[in-house]
Structure formats: structure tokens, C-alpha cells
A protein has these predicted regions:
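H-loop/switch region of ABC-family ATPase nucleotide-binding domains
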Residues: 204-205
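Conserved ABC ATPase "signature" region
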Residues: 28-29, 110, 122-139
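A short, surface-exposed alpha-helical micro-motif characterized by mixed small hydrophobic
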Residues: 210-212
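The feature captures the beta-strand-to-loop junction immediately N-terminal to the Walker
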Residues: 58-60
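Pre-NBD coupling/linker segments of ABC/ABC-like ATPases
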Residues: 1-41, 232-245
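Conserved ABC ATPase "signature" C-loop
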Residues: 222-223, 238
Length: 246
């Protein structure tokens, strides 16, 4: 039997933060005092994602979902453990990540595309499609700092959806925006993940999204994998857990 090709391999991953909650005012600005308390956001997580699979990640706030996703994307460096990616390009679709807020939406399309490895000519060939899908109109020529979270989400999703990558990391963006755009982006997402060569990791609180789109789900709790497996089974367990927590 042919061995399954892996797109993402995470081994014994640890990611820590230092809580610098004590500051002093010195010349040049705020300076942190003391060592601060170390917060262990991800603690010894290991898993593999086969090429073409859609993995869901669930867990309550503070469970380490976002930290894990940003570590996979390369934004955060592991304190220990390893992350191996087997793809030509990777994109992180997350609110508040990846845009230069002083630049316009139009300029950020080029910046994002170049960071994904696209040439200026390749981006120019697709920029009209990106702008049209985003529905931002003339706002595309305004600085991103003036955008609402919904507008930011529309632009981020449109760039990632039109400038397709081998590995897509999606952080809750399908829950932001007006009802029309949510439906349109959800349908586009289903179209994108229908490609057997594309690997997707989705962080979501929405059980229906994970059940419908994902082949497998990992349930994170306090930085550890609490459970993993079939989305229908795991999400039912997770929902019951959250009801008891409430």
C-alpha cells in the first residue's frame, strides 16, 4: 500500500508566552520589569495532516487554537518541538494578521501576494477578481486602518481565495461579515477545498462548519489535545462539554 503523503507534521510542539505585566516609564518609552510569569499556550502537541485533508481545530477561548495556527504559519516560533510543511505555498487567513494598516487595501493585495510568492504580473492578472469578490468598492483605495473587522475579513478572504495556496490556515473568518458575504465565502471555501491537492486547517467554534467541511477534528483544551477523530463524534462531545461548562 502506498504511504500517505503528509502536508503538515507537528511533533511535540511547545509554545510559551512570558506575561510581562509589570512596566516602568523610562526615557524612550515603556520598559518591562521583572521576568514575568510564563504561560504555556501549547504543550506537547503532535499530529499529522495528510495532503488534501481538511482538519478542524476546536476548543474554548484560551485553549491554544490561535497560537497553534500561528505557529504553523511561521508567525510564532516553537519553544521546542518541530513543524514540517510540505507545500509550495501557505496562507493564514485571520483577522488582524497579515496587513500593513497604513497601506491601502489595493497596496495590501500586492504585498500579500508577493509574500505568498506571486510575481507582480501574476497579482495584476487576478487583482480585479480579488477586488470584485471583496465587495469593498472604493474602500479598496483607503488605508486598511479605516476598515471594520468585517471589511478586513472580506479583503483577507478574497486574497486567499483568489491567490490559491497549497496549504490554507483559516481562523474564524467565516464568522465575520454580513450574511450575504458569509454565504458567498462559505460556498467559495467548499469550492477551494474540493481540490484534492489542497490542505486546509480550520479553527472554528461552529460545529456545523467543522462537521460539514472537515475530515478530522482536534479538540484542544488548555494547550493539550483532549480528543481527536471523526468530526461528528468529537463535536458532539465538545458541545456537551461546553454546555456543562456553562
Amino acid at each position: 500500500m502506498k504511504k500517505e503523503e503528509m502536508a503538515i507534521t507537528v511533533k511535540d510542539l511547545h509554545v510559551y508566552y512570558r506575561d510581562m505585566n509589570r512596566f516602568s516609564l523610562k526615557k524612550g518609552g515603556l520598559k518591562a520589569r521583572g521576568t514575568g510569569k510564563i504561560f504555556k499556550a501549547v504543550k506537547g502537541v503532535s499530529f499529522e495532516v495528510p495532503k488534501g485533508q481538511i482538519l478542524g481545530i476546536c476548543g474554548k477561548n484560551g485553549s491554544g487554537k490561535r497560537t497553534l495556527l500561528r505557529a504553523i504559519s511561521g508567525i510564532f516560533s516553537p519553544d521546542s518541538g518541530s513543524i514540517n510543511l510540505h507545500g509550495n505555498s501557505i496562507s493564514l487567513l485571520s483577522i488582524g494578521v497579515g496587513f500593513q494598516k497604513q497601506l491601502t487595501g489595493y497596496e495590501n493585495i500586492f504585498l500579500s501576494g508577493m509574500l505568498l510568492g506571486y510575481s507582480k504580473e501574476q497579482i495584476e492578472a487576478k487583482i480585479d477578481d480579488i477586488i470584485e469578490f471583496s465587495e469593498l468598492g472604493d474602500f479598496i483605495y483607503r488605508p486598511v486602518r479605516s476598515y471594520s473587522s468585517g471589511m478586513h475579513s472580506k479583503l483577507a478572504f478574497s486574497i486567499t481565495a483568489i491567490l490559491e495556496t497549497d496549504i490554507m490556515l483559516i481562523d474564524e473568518v467565516l464568522s465575520v461579515g454580513d450574511i450575504h458575504f458569509k454565504e458567498k465565502s462559505y460556498n467559495k471555501m467548499k469550492e477551494l477545498i474540493s481540490n484534492d491537492d489542497r490542505t486546509v486547517v480550520i479553527v472554528s467554534h461552529n460545529s456545523n462548519t467543522i462537521k460539514e467541511l472537515c475530515n478530522k477534528v482536534i479538540w484542544l483544551h488548555e494547550g493539550l489535545i483532549k480528543d481527536q477523530g471523526d468530526p461528528n463524534i468529537i463535536m458532539d462531545k465538545y458541545e456537551a462539554f461546553m454546555r456543562n461548562e456553562g
